[in-house]
Each structure stands twice: as C-alpha cells, then as structure tokens.
C-alpha cells in the first residue's frame, strides 16, 4: 500500500490509473479506524480496481467546544488495518495543504435543506465543514465511486445532494451500519465511553427498535417518539433529538409516507452518540 501526503504526487499517481481505465474508489475517513470503516474499504475493494482511503481530521467540521484536539490520531495502526483489507493508497494531507489560506478565508460549500435540523441544528457549521472537505477530496481524487456509512445518515444524504447539485460524476455508495454484538453502532467516539457507560449505551439502539416496532404496529408517530424520548431519559441519556423523517430526503413525513427513517442523537455522559433505523410505515 502506498502512503502519500503530497497533493501533486496523489494526482500524478491517480492520473496514471485513470489513463489505464481503472475504476477508482474513495473511502474518506478521519482515522481511528474500526470495523465500520473497514467495511467501507471491503465494499470498495469488491467494486474497484484502485481503492483510495483518506485520513484527515478535518478542523472545519468541529465546533468550538467539540473534540478536535482530543480526537484520536492513530495513523500507524490505521495504515496497517487499511493494508490488511486491500487498500491500495492512503492519502494523509496536511491541514495547510488543503486549507492554504486558513479556515476562515477558505471557500466553503454549504448544502441547504438536508443539512438543516437534526445534527445540523445541534452542530452549527458541521455539515458545511463536511461538504467542503468532501468536495476537496472529490476534486483531488476524482473517484468513480465514494463510500460512506449509513450510520451517519444525515451526512450520507448531504453528500448525495452535494453530488447531485454540483454534478460530480461520482457514484455514492451507502454501506449498512456495522454494530457490536450488543447492537451499539460502531463509532470512533465509542472509545470516549466509560466502562459503565459502554454497558448502558446499547439501550440507544434498543429504544430505536422499540419505537420502530410501535410504528409498525400502527401507533401514531408523536406518541411513539414521545415514549422513546422518555425511555432514553430513564436510561440516563440526554437526547438532542429523536425524529421520524422521510428516508428519501429527510423531509417531514406525510400521511402517504411509506419509507421513513428514525434518527436519534443523545449524550451519554460526555459522549454524543447517533444512530438510525429504517422503518416501513403501515398504510
């Protein structure tokens, strides 16, 4: 596996791959990799000739009081994991290479509508940071396909709209959420949980499943969501939101909505956890 941090070297290497008509897949990450990230690499490996992963802790998507400084940097272990899953190239750019004029002066990309509400309401500017760095990486790598986990469902929808609106010729592939045996969605931030919190954390997914089952049984969404929020509070969570949205665009559900998605964000101690679950609403 090749490791590059220079933009010019990256472009030269991938130019040769495109010249040979090779299909290029991109897996953007912030590092501190777990089995969820590696599932993206595995999916890319099945589909492409050249698999490119990026490791970049993007300061533009962190808020002022968030965990940018403490976010784990585990480059050596990450590189070993990527190589063992068949990644061909890992790109590890410096911040001043991607943002040469600084964060405030850099052109930023904002995706309206789908980035508003949910995590967008609780993390102002987060999705602008995500859309900006992903646009940069799309421009530098010029992949045929890019792979994102569905655990970050709102982010996945932001990227899909970004690609559609800006006419990037890139296929966006969503990979199902990877979970621990007890149901907790895999996340780099799970490492922030204390041992006691880690034991309680699977209740987030269990609550989603309970709300899902109530909705499938015909319970009115406001009632099911209210009961879900109460259940989370009883189990020690501080919810940011628990909402039911249209799966296709995160718009509000309507009487004729069939395919919906439950989305939750909640704090357990100092750790913010997110999850989601698709639900087919009864007619």
Swiss-Prot record:
Give the enzyme's main class according to its UniProt record, as a single word.
ligase
List, alphabetically, the Gene3D superfamilies matched. HUPs, Pantoate-beta-alanine ligase, C-terminal domain
One Gene Ontology BP term is:
pantothenate biosynthetic process
Query: Where's the active site on this chain?
Result: 37 (proton donor)
State its Enzyme Commission number(s).
6.3.2.1
In Pfam terms, one family for this protein is: Pantoate_ligase
Q: Which residues bind ATP?
A: 30-37, 149-152, 186-189
InterPro entries noted in UniProt: Pantoate_ligase, Pantoate_ligase_C, Rossmann-like_a/b/a_fold
Compartments, as annotated in UniProt:
Cytoplasm
Reaction catalysed by this chain?
A: (R)-pantoate + beta-alanine + ATP = (R)-pantothenate + AMP + diphosphate + H(+)
Q: Which family does it belong to?
A: Belongs to the pantothenate synthetase family.
The record's note on quaternary structure and interaction partners says: Homodimer.
Q: What is this protein called?
A: Pantothenate synthetase
Record gene name: panC
């Amino acid at each position: 596996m090749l490791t590059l941090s220079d933009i010019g070297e990256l472009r030269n290497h991938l130019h040769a791959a495109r010249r040979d008509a090779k299909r290029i897949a991109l897996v953007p990450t912030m590092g501190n990799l777990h089995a969820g990230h590696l599932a993206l690499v595995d999916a890319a490996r099945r589909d492409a000739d050249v698999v490119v992963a990026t490791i970049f802790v993007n300061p533009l998507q962190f808020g002022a009081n968030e965990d940018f400084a403490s976010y784990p940097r585990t480059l050596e272990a990450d590189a070993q994991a990527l190589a063992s899953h068949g990644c061909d190239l890992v790109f590890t750019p410096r911040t001043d290479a991607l943002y040469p004029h600084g964060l405030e002066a850099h052109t930023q990309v904002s995706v309206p509508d789908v980035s508003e509400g949910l995590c967008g309401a609780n993390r102002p500017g987060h999705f602008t940071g995500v859309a900006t760095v992903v646009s940069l990486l799309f421009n530098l790598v010029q992949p045929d396909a890019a792979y994102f986990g569905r655990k970050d469902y709102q982010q996945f929808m932001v990227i899909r709209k970004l690609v559609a609106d800006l006419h990037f010729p890139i296929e966006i592939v969503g990979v199902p959420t990877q979970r621990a045996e007890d149901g907790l969605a895999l996340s780099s931030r799970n490492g922030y949980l204390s041992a006691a919190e880690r034991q309680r954390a699977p209740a987030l997914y269990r609550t989603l499943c309970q709300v899902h089952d109530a909705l499938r049984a015909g319970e009115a969404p406001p009632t099911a969501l209210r009961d879900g929020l109460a259940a989370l509070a009883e189990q020690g969570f501080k919810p940011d939101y628990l909402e039911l949205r249209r799966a296709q665009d995160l718009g509000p559900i309507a009487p004729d909505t069939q395919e919906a998605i439950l989305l939750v964000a909640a704090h357990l101690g100092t750790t913010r956890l997110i999850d989601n679950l698709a639900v087919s609403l009864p007619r």
